[in-house]
């Protein structure tokens, strides 16, 4: 299991974990967010959320 907390400024660290499953950050209402492709579809990752990759390689987001 691997995890990384999104800080709003660590896109390269998130990209290293998620590869092409994550889209470039975007700015909305004063915050930076990401979109992450999971088995359930695209999920918005907000600053302070934690992205988790389980032992099967699947991603989910913890708030």
Predicted stretch roles:
Residues 1-39:
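N-terminal non-globular leader segments, chiefly Sec-dependent signal peptides
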Residues 40-63:
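Short, compact, well-ordered microdomains
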